[in-house]
Each structure stands twice: as structure tokens, then as C-alpha cells.
Swiss-Prot record:
Protein task: Catalyzes the decarboxylation of orotidine 5'-monophosphate (OMP) to uridine 5'-monophosphate (UMP).
Taxonomic source organism: Latilactobacillus sakei subsp. sakei (strain 23K)
Keyword Coiled coil (UniProt): no
Complex and partners: Homodimer.
Pfam family, one: OMPdecase
InterPro entries reported for this sequence: Aldolase_TIM, OMPdecase, OMPdecase_AS, OMPdecase_bac, OMPdeCOase_dom, RibuloseP-bd_barrel
CDD domains for the chain: OMP_decarboxylase_like
Full protein name: Orotidine 5'-phosphate decarboxylase
Name of the gene: pyrF
Length: 239
């Protein structure tokens, strides 16, 4: 699963999460994303439970604090043995490097493979007008994203979370193997909801995304497994 379809488990508790997962074959090698709500409700035991099912895990907590605090928190995350985790690029180079160091230290302590550290650039719910007016950023949205991506690469991160439209620019300014993981994925028949820079699975593949994160089009589907298979098929159709 080099370029995965990652299911965002945006549920309030383990009971609802497990009810959803029971709709998938037990041998389906899922890659799932755990966000703040579910992790804060269930804690690290949730990660252990999912790993026992041989799921790959993206722990999306978007750390953003002073460098020492981020390093300590990332050490704990590193011990969990997750596959991906996130940090805010806006925290700056010292914070990003501290997070990367903590993640590797925690993995070493637990004798597990270090997670890929992905930096948040601009949220896919943010448009250019909002960014310029509310963040007082004078450059364009693509320029801001590219700047954060370069900063992340220079600060020991493995990649970024970004909209698919930004991938070409990011890879041209970083490296072809710098990971670009794409949220805001919506099949053509789906509503965009609060994702303002959404694309289809095929479009993301054509733009060379290294992985897509899909939530409601799967979790709120009448048949989640069928919806997952359809999205996965579309995603993998572009070679």
C-alpha cells in the first residue's frame, strides 16, 4: 500500500467506530486516520486496538506548541508505532525539528518504525481570501503552501498535508519523494461540505498525490465497503 486510501474515522467514540469497521471484511488491510475527537475520547488504547487488527494508522493531532512541549508529545506518539502523524508548519523550524527528533526518539525507545511526519500547510477549509484577511498573509495561497512545504522539508519532515492542486508546485520546490497526502477528496457525485479545495480520487492520482484521505463519502455511505472499493478503484486506475 505505497499510496494508500486512508479512511478518516471521524466518530465520537469507539462504539460507533467499531460498528463502522465491522462492515469491512476482517482481512481488509485498512489504513485509517484517527483525529482529535476520537483520540481524546479513547486515548492510546484505541491505537493498540487498531494495531491488533493489523490496520495502518494515521494519528492526526496537528501539534502546535513551543518546541520542548512538541518534542515531548511527539516522543509519546513515536512510542505508539503509528504510521503517519502531523504537526503545524506554522510553528516554525525549531518546533518542526524538535517534533521530528521526539518522534524518532520515541520510536527508538519502543523499538518500532518511526512514523512519517507530515506538516500542515494551509487547511483545505481555508481559501485565499480568508488566509489573507484573517492571517494577514500577503502572498497567494499557493505561495504560502509552497513556503511551508519548503520549511517542512528543511526541518526533517517527511511530507505535507496539502490540496491536490498544490502538489506539482510543492514537489518542484522540494523533492519528488517528498510526500504529499491529500484530504478533501470527494467523488464526483458527493457534496464538498466544508472542503473548499476538494478533488476527486482520479484527479488526485493524476496530480501525483502520495495518499488520499476520505471521510464522509465512505463513513456516511449506505454501504461503506462498496464506497471504499469504488474510491480505491478510481484512485488506483491511474498508473
Amino acid at each position: 500500500m505505497t499510496n494508500p486510501v486512508i479512511i478518516a474515522l471521524d466518530f465520537p467514540n469507539w462504539q460507533k467506530t467499531d460498528q463502522f469497521l465491522q462492515q469491512f471484511p476482517k482481512d481488509e488491510a485498512l489504513f485509517v486516520k484517527i483525529g482529535m475527537e476520537l483520540f481524546y475520547q479513547e486515548g492510546p488504547q484505541l491505537i493498540k486496538t487498531l494495531k491488533a487488527r493489523d490496520y495502518r494508522i494515521f494519528l492526526d493531532l496537528k501539534l502546535y506548541d513551543i518546541p520542548n512541549t512538541v518534542q515531548s508529545a511527539m516522543t509519546v506518539i513515536g512510542q505508539l508505532g503509528v504510521d503517519y502523524t502531523t504537526i503545524h508548519a506554522a510553528g516554525g523550524q525549531t518546533m518542526l525539528q524538535a517534533g521530528a527528533a521526539g518522534l524518532k526518539a520515541g520510536a527508538k525507545q519502543a523499538n518500532v518504525k518511526p512514523a512519517k511526519l507530515l506538516a500542515i500547510t494551509q487547511l483545505t477549509s481555508t481559501n485565499e481570501a480568508q488566509m489573507q484577511q484573517e492571517q494577514l498573509v500577503s502572498v497567494s495561497l499557493p505561495e504560502s503552501v509552497a513556503h511551508y512545504a519548503q520549511l517542512a522539508q528543511q526541518s526533517d519532515c517527511d511530507g505535507v498535508i496539502c490540496s491536490a492542486q498544490e502538489i506539482t508546485t510543492i514537489k518542484s520546490k522540494t523533492a519528488t519523494d517528498f510526500l504529499c497526502v491529500t484530504p478533501g477528496i470527494r467523488p464526483a457525485t458527493s457534496q464538498n461540505n466544508d472542503q473548499k479545495r476538494a478533488v476527486t480520487p482520479l484527479e488526485a492520482a493524476q496530480m501525483h498525490s502520495n495518499g488520499i484521505v476520505v471521510g464522509r463519502p465512505i463513513t456516511q455511505a449506505s454501504d461503506p465497503y462498496q464506497a471504499y472499493q469504488a474510491i480505491k478503484s478510481e484512485w488506483e486506475s491511474f498508473k
